[in-house]
Amino acid sequence: MGALTSRQHAGVEEVDIPSNSVYRYPPKSGSYFASHFIMGGEKFDSTHPEGYLFGENSDLNFLGNRPVVFPYAAPPPQEPVKTLRSLVNIRKDTLRLVKCAEEVKSPGEEASKAKVHYNVEFTFDTDARVAITIYYQATEEFQNGIASYIPKDNSLQSETVQYKRGVCQQFCLPSHTVDPSEWAEEELGFDLDREVYPLVVHAVVDEGDEYFGHCHVLLGTFEKHTDGTFCVKPLKQKQVVDGVSYLLQEIYGIENKYNTQDSKVAEDEVSDNSAECVVCLSDVRDTLILPCRHLCLCNTCADTLRYQANNCPICRLPFRALLQIRAMRKKLGPLSPTSFNPIISSQTSDSEEHPSSENIPPGYEVVSLLEALNGPLTPSPAVPPLHVLGDGHLSGMLPSYGSDGHLPPVRTISPLDRLSDSSSQGLKLKKSLSKSTSQNSSVLHEEEDEHSCSESETQLSQRPSVQHLGEECGVTPESENLTLSSSGAIDQSSCTGTPLSSTISSPEGPASSSLAQSVMSMASSQISTDTVSSMSGSYIAPGTEEEGEALSSPQPASRAPSEEGEGLPAESPDSNFAGLPAGEQDAEGNDVIEEEDGSPTQEGQRTCAFLGMECDNNNDFDIASVKALDNKLCSEVCLPGAWQADDNAVSRNAQRRRLSSSSLEDSETRPCVWGPLAV
């Protein structure tokens, strides 16, 4: 510019100056910049002579050779500044080379020397129809304000692909491949003297004469790795609007780090990755500081900062102007599925307090700039869908207390697992003297028991059908998965379960053992002691003598002192008691005997061969029966019998034990000793 800007007249004059002198930095003669610059309609003196305000001085070489006539005609003072509209945007961070699935081999070429070809892919946004073409080893030319790129060979370009308007569109052209190994090493990068760009992505708006010449250009270079592979890196981006070429610069603080990989988020926790203003820490940042290009202030704090200081809060450099960038969207209807966003509402409510809100068109609302460009700032984790089992199958899953959202595998918990669960969780469930259950602390909703402790029997009711049970628990017939939420209610939307919980389904008997096992698994899950209320007695599963010797050390942890005042269940071959083979019990040495009106637990502590967990019953203590989820008796559920080792087990420590659901009719053919059940 130099001598040209010092002329007093504003007329256009043809000056014969070589294009490579004044419009290249550093110029061969004269000065590139004047002693002042104009920004926001104001005139400022240049503090740094020959210094580019918005980037490195070398970036000026990407602007091209005199795209328009110069000097510019000064606009009238009363004419407002016209905002340029960018119709196409290529997300340069998504530009990449993808290796083709099959290597291209020439005839007679060895397999080790096969050439590797790549596809070029990237993501772009467009508000109009656009035609995209990729050029290699191309030079740039401007003719009548229209940018064109000419490759050194006609084969070094792709076919033109048409796209409609849309956001987050993926450019992928499998028919077009590129092999950077065919070029010389100096051709992989950009050389200012040669003025040849290794890669040019040219996106031209195809919307008629109104936007004639409007285009977006992405310049890139290639790099070769040590293993012989290649990658592409973006160099610069340009926008041509109304015959003028604009160089796009980065805005610091506009990236959304919430959508990056988890590892990167963990590394950047200490960095400034929030969307709030760095001064007030409440409003959303929407004001850009120039010339340092830090997006770190809200409109209110930026207006205050103009009269208090003239330094950027981030880099402490003096700023010359403030640029507010606001994104707007149509207001969502009341029936819109989009959830309420507090950041959007806060920005909208705050903007109404300022006069700048008058520029908002009717029917639109202000949205965070970060959210408009990158989507939601804090996306909610995806909830896994409900897995529908077969008809009549009920799966009891316990609430998840961790971050693992995967469902546990379908398995049966062995007694070794139950013992480890009880010791790890530290749950020592003792027999309680209370006769009622609190509605707030119970996992299942129960009615308050008004029977006294002296009662020995309670009238038993029939268990409802599986379909009726699902209806009472709020489960639709289409999805019969039941989830026990941590709040105590049955939550169908929560689909996560702890790895220790059991999900059991039997194809032969729909309700044979799944409900009973899921109820027993509650004792070994992560449930606090206030969620499991008083029970009547304890059921100790029989085992072998070897197991009793191996597990004799943690005996005090599994024993609970019996207390007086408990109900005495009557002896009856009913579903209230589980049948135990007399032979196995005698071999174990358990002193469990039949009593007419005796307590199921002797005075003192009970010794068992296999140390299971003693739990309290969720029902009142004079009933030793299993109840359904609606507090009704499950007459169809067979209570667990003896522990049986799996045939496929390799060792005692690796055995997976299961509960054999024995039929009640088998109890008549073999000698059994009836004992109370505890789950």
UniProtKB/Swiss-Prot annotation:
Induction: Expression is cell cycle-specific with higher levels in cells arrested in G1/S and G2/M. It is found in: Cytoplasm. SUPFAM superfamilies: RING/U-box (SSF57850). Residues 339-349, 478-537 have a biased composition (Polar residues). Residues 585-598 have a biased composition (Acidic residues). SMART domains: RING (SM00184). This is E3 ubiquitin ligase RNF157.
